[in-house]
Amino acid sequence: MSNEIVKFSNQFNNVALKKFDAVHLDVLMAIASRVRERGTATVEFSFEELRGLMRLKQNLTNKQLADKIVQTNARLLALNYMFEDSGKIIQFALFTVFETDPANQTLEVSVNERFAFLLNDLTSQFTRFELAEFADLKSKYAKEFYRRAKQYRSSGIWKVSRDEFCRLLNVSKSTSDSVSNLNRVVLKPIVEECGPLLGLKIERQYAKRRLSGFVFTFARETPPVIDARPVKAKEEQDSGHWTSVAGYGEVFTTTELFDVTAARDHFDGTVDAGECRYCRYDARNRERHARNAGTLF
């Protein structure tokens, strides 16, 4: 199964997913990878497909998997979401349809129109990562840290207070109140799993001798600068080749100076058109910016 891309509004990272374990998080992100940019259309998964997306290593029966799926949505419904523009707090009903069929081993989901903005029409201020990398992490704390780090992938730095860090990662009070417990239960698995993957370093901040926050630094995802040849010269090219871009399949390109990361940023609209290397490289690409078009000039 080709690697899938998870993409959602940064606002979703402000929601603390309470009572989610590692499997619940994998279920949610697997679903998110397939419903993105699908509006409110109903999307069906087979249990076999879901297992593949989750890279499920636990030997769960179909009934146990069905229970985990149902629990995932139940935990979402137990959360509150605050709309930034109005300050209203409502039940986090992310899906209007969430139908689990253990007998036929299928799941049907449809995104609630009210929350569709979290997963659709994303051209700026969003988090994006590879589902396979997320699923391969074992600790729920490593998974929750990973998606926040991906929000800041372009800067490579996340500054957060101790209290906010513990809230976002849903750290229990008994763990958050004790520095030794916080180090052992939360930070240790984050360092062990995300350290090699992200090049992670942690700077602890103190106020009045008390641990007050963290500065996490990690490798920036900055595409290399490419050689921008004159547009006229490029337009004269009449041949190209197919190149595989994870999450987008095969992309036809007429440039030999191809960069996968820059291409994904162009397709997703991670960067504005004015800063996009492919839009600067060829004016024709501007018409296709953030539209998932399968051609690059």
Swiss-Prot record:
Pfam families to which the protein is assigned, alphabetical: Rep3_C, Rep3_N
Keyword entries, A-Z: DNA replication, Plasmid
InterPro entries in UniProt: Initiator_Rep_WH1, WH-like_DNA-bd_sf, WH_DNA-bd_sf
GO term, biological process aspect, one: DNA replication initiation
Residue ranges of the TM segments: none
Source superkingdom: Bacteria
GO MF annotation terms: DNA-directed DNA polymerase activity
Residues in coiled coil: none
Keyword Transmembrane: no
Annotated family: Belongs to the initiator RepB protein family.
Protein name in the entry: Probable replication protein rep
